[in-house]
Every structure is written in structure tokens, then in C-alpha cells.
Amino acid sequence: YKRQGTVTAVATTAVERVGTQTGLPFGRYAYTTALQPQVAHVPAIVPLAWFAMGLPAREAAHSALGAHSTPARRIALGSAALTAWDLFLDPQMVGEGYWVWARRGIYRGIPLGNFVGWFVTSLGVMTALEALLPPNAYVDGSADADGALVGEYTFMGVMETIGFARFFRDPTVAIVGGLGMLPIAAVAVAGKFRG
């Protein structure tokens, strides 16, 4: 996954840099100095996170779609799956002081336009992954890796839901994020059992 990771990291670093300078596509925000190191004023961990959850989101989409999986459908559902993760990520990172919004939004201080920007950026990430992964990436010997990626997406959804409900004591984020990630995860896991 070196090539896919490199392309995703470079592209999302550029998107994040443009975002902090122009407000597009997420809205006006700025990274604090809490996350280091930074590249072009973007914490290095941020583009890595896009890739680290992009692959599981894509595989969850593929598994959920089953026999109806096509590149366009994987891109669309994978983008929704990745954006659903941000329903947990952004409230946590804003709460920890890793980035700040110029104007508080209605969802835990996050503007709703951020999630539109996430979906648009996720479309680019999913399109890149679709182009860079070979057409047979989902057959002949990849079942274990694919299952692990579905497991990772599901684990993140479950643990984030429990974490916000129990430890962060934020039932709103637990419910909203859970409703975003867990249905996709459940259908993806069922798809793995369908075979």
C-alpha cells in the first residue's frame, strides 16, 4: 500500500493546506501547534489518518455492497463511510484543542459544512484508491486482508460509540457517530459472512 498511502498523504496534505488558507472545502479552521510534526502547517498525522481509515472505509463499502459492488458505488459509499468517521473524529480533536474553527457550528462546535467538505475530499480519496488498487484486489487470497479492514472499520465504530457514551460522556456524539458508522459496519460484516 506504499503507493496508495503516498498519493493519499500528498493529496490530503494539499487539501488540508488549502483548507486552512481559504476555508475550502471544510470551512475556516486552523491547526494549533499541539500536534507535531507539521508539514506546511498541517500535522503529519492528519494525512496518514485519511489513508488509515480510507482503506477500511473502502473495504466496508465493498463488503456492504456485495454483488452490487461497482467502482462508482464503492466510491460513493466509501466516501459516506469515511465521512461518518469524522462525526466522531472532529468533536474529539476539537475538544482536545488540536484544531479550532473560526465560527462555532451547531454540532459540538463544528460547522455542518465541514462534513460536506469531508464527503467531497473523501470522494477524491476513494477515487484515488479505486484507481491505484488493481481490479482484482478483492479476489484470490485477499479475503484475510479485506476481512481485517472490515474488522478495523467496525472496531472503530463500536469503540468510538462506547467511548463517547461511557468515557467522554457525550451521548450526542455517540448517537450521531454511531448512526453514521455502525449501519455501514453491520452490513459490511454481514457481507463477509455472505461470502
Per-segment meaning from a language model:
Residues 1-4:
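Conserved small/polar residues in nucleotide/adenosyl-binding loops
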Residues 135-137, 189-195:
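Membrane-interface capping segments at transmembrane-helix boundaries
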Residues 13, 17-21, 79-96:
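Transmembrane alpha-helix/helix-exit interface in multi-pass inner-membrane proteins
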Residues 172-187:
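Small-residue-rich transmembrane alpha-helices that serve as helix-helix interface/gating elements
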Residues 38-56, 110-124:
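Membrane-interface loop-to-helix entry segments
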Residues 11, 27-30, 47-71:
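Internal transmembrane alpha-helix with an interfacial aromatic "cap," most often the third helix
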Residues 93, 97-115:
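Membrane-interfacial catalytic/cofactor-binding modules of polytopic membrane enzymes
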Residues 66-80, 136-152:
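Internal alpha-helical transmembrane segments of multi-pass membrane proteins
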